Amino acid sequence: MAKKQSILSPIIRITFTFLVLCGLVYPLIVTGIAQAVMKDNADGSLIYNDKNEVIGSKLIGQNFTDPRYFHGRVSSIEYKAEASGSNNYAPSNPDLEKRVEKSIEEWKKQNPTVPVTEVPIDLVTNSGSGLDPDISPKAASVQVERISKITNIPKETLNQLIKDQTEGAALGLFGETRVNVLKLNLELQKLLK
């Protein structure tokens, strides 16, 4: 019995010590450093409106369907962050072809003057997460004609808006040149008022 207690006592102490260190101390230290060094990122890169209300995140895409606004990528999960993921069909899967054809048909209804051959792939395919907040500058540019026609905002103004909101590759190396759809639409909304 005494031998059993002598073995259990250090095991219990070590378990409790690591529980406190890994479950409490480490997360608090990491959170504290993140809040001090990069508060915006640590809080989820939230975007606020003029009333200081959260309207979205720079990191999570939103579904824009109003033809006056720029549209983002297709999302098979309808931009529900808790369901992050995508079907990620193989190129040989007939379901991928059906999904892309459906996206192209929807595109043609909203943008009848833009030839299908000019539609960038990111407007008719899912991202891996289904939550991608960005599109390519070309994907934004092919929507200019529709938005200009509906809103009477000159194409030159919309193209400048895209240029102003275009972000380069991270550190000049990682990723692609991109436009955050939510930020772009917030700037567009200022012109619509």
Curated annotation (Swiss-Prot):
Keywords (A to Z) from UniProt: ATP-binding, Cell membrane, Ion transport, Membrane, Nucleotide-binding, Potassium, Potassium transport, Transmembrane, Transmembrane helix, Transport
Record-linked Pfam families: KdpC
GO terms assigned for molecular function: ATP binding; P-type potassium transmembrane transporter activity
Transmembrane regions listed in the UniProt entry: 14-34
Annotated Gene Ontology cellular component terms: plasma membrane
InterPro entries referenced in this protein's UniProt entry, alphabetically: KdpC
Main location: membrane
Subcellular location: Cell membrane
Topology term for the membrane: Single-pass membrane protein
Coiled coil: none
Family: Belongs to the KdpC family.
Function, in words: Part of the high-affinity ATP-driven potassium transport (or Kdp) system, which catalyzes the hydrolysis of ATP coupled with the electrogenic transport of potassium into the cytoplasm. This subunit acts as a catalytic chaperone that increases the ATP-binding affinity of the ATP-hydrolyzing subunit KdpB by the formation of a transient KdpB/KdpC/ATP ternary complex.
The protein's assembly and partners: The system is composed of three essential subunits: KdpA, KdpB and KdpC.
PANTHER family: POTASSIUM-TRANSPORTING ATPASE C CHAIN, POTASSIUM-TRANSPORTING ATPASE KDPC SUBUNIT
UniProt name for this protein: Potassium-transporting ATPase KdpC subunit
Organism: Bacillus cereus (strain ATCC 10987 / NRS 248)
Lineage, top ranks: Bacteria, Bacillati, Bacillota, Bacilli, Bacillales
